[in-house]
Structure formats: C-alpha cells, structure tokens
A protein has these predicted regions:
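Membrane-interfacial entry segments at the cytosolic side of transmembrane helices
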Residues: 141-153, 294-301
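A cytosolic-side transmembrane-helix exit/cap motif
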Residues: 120-123, 169-175, 279-282, 297-306, ...
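Aromatic-enriched
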Residues: 286-356
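Primarily membrane-embedded glycan-assembly and transfer machineries that use lipid-linked glycans
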Residues: 1-118, 144-274
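Membrane-interface alpha helices of multi-pass inner-membrane proteins
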Residues: 118-141, 261-268
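Membrane helix-loop boundary segments at the extracytoplasmic
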Residues: 91, 96-99, 269-280, 310-326
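Hydrophobic/aromatic-rich transmembrane helices and adjacent perimembrane loops
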Residues: 135, 273-289
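Membrane-embedded alpha-helical segments of transport systems
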Residues: 55-56, 128-131, 308
Length: 356
C-alpha cells in the first residue's frame, strides 16, 4: 500500500520547479525535496529510504529510553509494547510516512542528555522535515524556541537557494498549499473513515440526509470551513497561557501539557492519519519512567494504551482487510481520544482553577 509521503516525494523530487510550478501545489518543506532529489539521483529506491528511517527511528527511541531510564529491561519492554501493541510503526512503514521519524527525533531530544544547542539543531532539522511539529517546540522554553526558529529559517532559505527557487515566493506557495488542504472529502470515504480528527465526523454528520439542507447543516459546514483557524486559535491560546505562567521556562516534564497538545493535534488538525497518535509515546514514557507519583497517572496510562490498542486484532486470523481494519480501529481510537481530551481539559483547567 505504498502511497504515503515517500512515494509523493519521489515524484516531486523529479520536478525542476517544485515550488513555482503553476500546475502543481505542494506543501512539503524544501529540505525534504532536496534530500530526495539527491537520493533519487543516486539511483536508490525509495523503499530503502523508507525502511532506513523506520529502523533508525526505533534506534532513537530505544537509545533515549535507555539513557533516561538506565534500565535496559524497561527500555526493551517499552519499545516492544509500542511497536507490537500499537499499529503506528507497521502502518507508517506500510504507508511510507515520515511522521514516525519526526516523532522519534522529538522523543530523542526530550529523553537523551543533550545540550541546548544540540536540542535546537535537532528540533530545527525536525521542523525542516515536518513543519507541523512546530506546535510542540514552545514546551522546551523560550531560549530553545528562539534558537530553533533562527536555525530553521536558515535551513529553509539555504534549501530554497540550493533548489534554485526564489525564497519568498516559494515559501508563500508552500504555505498556501499547506493551508488549502481539502482532506477529508466525500470523494474518498476510506480516508474519511480513517481520519482520527473531529472534522471528519463533522463532515460526515453535515452530509446526512436529514441534516444536509437544514440550518444546522449550514452551521456545521461553517465550522468545518474554519477548522484551521479553530485549531491554530486553540494552540495560540494554550501557549499564551502556559508561557505567561512559566515565564518562558521549560515545560518538558509537564505530562498533562504534553497530553493536551498531543490530543489537540490529533483531534483538531485538519486530517489525522492512523499514525498521528504515536505522539502520545512521549507522555506515556514520562508517566511510566517517573520516579515520583503523577496525578492520575494510572488513568492516563490506561487511556493512552486504549488509543494504541489494536482492537480488531483477532480478525487477522481469519480475514484481514487493511481498510476495514483501519476504519474500526480509527473510530475506537477517536472515541477514546475524545474521552481523554475531556478528562485532561477538566484536570488542567477546572481543577486548577478550583485549587487556586
């Protein structure tokens, strides 16, 4: 089922003008295009690249888990739980998606003992491969955020120049392509059913026969049309509150904030594939590795495990259909994510207010 990021990038890398092409808009960052141009020109198959980044991702997760926990038995069990008991690794490998690799870099930066400059360099590299990861960077504190932003700017500029594309117009074209994404749509119900975000469900509800021509249907359509604004508004308000309270200091160990931002990116991003929930590996590791008790830690671990869980696993013994399987699993994962989101909002907003 090889139709993910790597197959698209293999095509884009063959274009002479990937960002100024009038007939084609694409939102991939220039560093990715540049890397794939060199990779394809070397005569290598994209499948090799796909396998490499996924194996390397596991090495990053294992080495940082071992470094943080100093317990090889725990690190091995944690890695096996994540790979074997969840679908993210296998389906990411099947799709040829780079998101798993980006999450592993984020995991490595958090739990491997690195200097500020080393963290900023790795985070800049991650943003240069997947810009959406930027919403998590403020959690590292104002200093790392500032250094990372400067380095990322230079990486983007140099990459555009290397591709012989105009920097400003190419960047605007990339942002416009990213903001005009139309997923999910009625033209592909399989994608709609596998969407973990709340928007796919709103889109489906809006097109029910009893609702489609009603005023409620128009209301749902207006919400759906402004989904990007709603998502970024929630992120902006969240970071404004937490940064003002922390005074720019690092919030790396704030497990409830990690859960909230992760679930926000899953439920409120325009389209969330089945592998996007893999970001919850970060708060899961904090919860399982902490030597101090964390409020509601058992509940949080249980809910994350339910999101990861392969619900239709027993069907594999008789009849395996990847699309039906994903549809069942993604709906279960969406339902648990929504419950978890309600729980975490209650804990970090209402309970904090009552305590204050």
């Amino acid at each position: 089922h090889y139709f993910g990021d790597t197959s698209e990038l293999a095509y884009l890398s063959k274009l002479e003008d990937p960002y100024t092409n009038e007939n084609f808009q694409q939102s991939y960052p220039p560093l990715l295009i540049l890397l794939f141009k060199n990779f394809i020109s070397s005569g290598q198959h994209v499948l090799i690249f796909n396998i490499f980044i996924h194996v390397f991702s596991l090495l990053l997760i294992f080495s940082s888990a071992l470094k943080s926990s100093k317990d090889i038995d725990f690190a091995v069990k944690f890695l096996l739980f994540f790979v074997v008991c969840s679908k993210f690794f296998i389906y990411s490998l099947d799709r040829g998606n780079i998101e798993f690799f980006i999450i592993s870099i984020l995991f490595f930066v958090l739990f491997f003992d690195l200097t500020i400059i080393q963290k900023a360099l790795l985070l800049s590299f991650a943003i240069s491969l997947k810009p959406s990861i930027l919403i998590f960077i403020p959690i590292f504190g104002f200093k790392i955020l500032s250094i990372t932003s400067i380095i990322t700017f230079f990486i983007y500029s140099i990459s555009f120049l290397w591709l012989k594309e105009p920097i400003f117009s190419s960047f605007l074209n990339m942002v416009n392509a990213f903001s005009s994404t139309k997923f999910p749509t009625l033209h592909n119900w399989q994608l709609l059913e596998q969407d973990l975000s709340i928007w796919g469900k709103i889109y489906w509800l809006r097109h029910l026969d009893s609702i489609v021509e009603s005023s409620f249907g128009s209301f749902l359509q207006s919400i759906y049309n402004n989904r990007s604004i709603i998502f970024y508004l929630v992120i902006l308000i969240t970071w404004s509150i937490f940064i003002s309270k922390s005074k720019g200091k690092s919030l790396e160990n704030n497990v409830e904030l990690w859960i909230f931002i992760s679930l926000t990116s899953i439920l409120l991003f325009s389209f969330s594939g089945v592998y996007k929930s893999a970001i919850l590996i970060i708060p899961l590791f904090i919860l399982m590795n902490s030597s101090k008790p964390i409020r509601n830690e058992n509940l949080y671990i249980f809910l994350i495990a339910m999101i990861f869980l392969q619900v239709p696993i027993f069907r594999h013994m008789f009849n395996f259909d990847i699309y039906s399987d994903l549809s069942i699993w993604s709906f279960f994962s969406f339902a648990v994510s929504l419950i978890f989101y309600s729980v975490i909002i209650n804990n970090i907003v209402f309970k904090v207010e009552r305590n204050e």
